[in-house]
């Protein structure tokens, strides 16, 4: 680390940025969302990456899986509302707003805060990673004001333009205060030069994850769940171009200049460089929150009396949705990208966000749903059998009464026929019984 930073001046001015990915629910029809290609208020952005396989690119480009929009037309109004509510928010620079909407009721707003290395402490105070309670009430007010400004300036506009009603992905109003705290983050930094050793970008990316000065030699032995990925070494200049640290709270990238480039990326170039990594992260966020929705639906199915009364139809629909998501909504790492390091980054993102564990849990709960389906089918068959038995008993009683009516006439031929029939039936059932006993004895002798 010390060798890397030798002869580097203006370390305080290293450009950094932070995407905060805010989860949402929406009500409305995904397929009915249409925006004119020339619309300047809500321009549609392409959800595609050169890192993706063609299979994934086609799925994302056709608009049936995800749609992406720039909502920077509301950026100025949102910032003004934020600053008007809390003056201390002027310390933070909000540079970009995007809206991602998926086809299953989940959506995201990404807010991008740009800052420099010298402002790392300020950003650390804003996020306060690793702590439930913030160090000051001012930070809570800044966060609440940001969320309220988005509700006022963005939510209504999205409803008007896209026809969907948004709400935060929370259980109740009280948990709204934890939205920013629990939101996944993408942290990025533009480094002044490329890396001779791939341990260097890992260390710098870890500092980015902890929201501290990138030049610090910072270590934390207690954080054992961090995973890393780096770009391949360039065969010409024999240097590495990037590295990332992946945790359950965020993914942090350290980008060096391009091959044979001596100048770091500027603010605009930094955001452009992070474009592919943002889209990769969004795919995992879609999987994470979809798993949460299915677990929620399954829980409600077994606890809500109203849903229980809906019975077989709702259960069948829930199973179908869950199986479709497991079959088509998720992709193995090898199907994500043609590049091994991107596949490994995706694999680590899935692992750290608990996607694979959640999928396994959903699969186990589908087994419970199958048992519930069998129980419902058994109850229905029992009801049908009871109805058939009841009609059978009624028929037998009616036949017996009719027979007694015939016998009561005193006709000797009728009485004799009835007795012969009864004796024949008794002999028939005795013969069946003796035959069954004989077969059992033969089986025992063998």
Task: Put a short name on every predicted segment.
Residues 385-446:
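Alpha-helical transmembrane anchor segments
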Residues 144, 155-157, 163, 172-175, ...:
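Aromatic-enriched hydrophobic runs in primary sequence
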Residues 117-128, 135, 303, 307-314, ...:
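Intrinsic-disorder/low-complexity, polar/charged segments
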Residues 1-241:
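Short Lys/Arg-enriched alpha/beta "domain-start" segment
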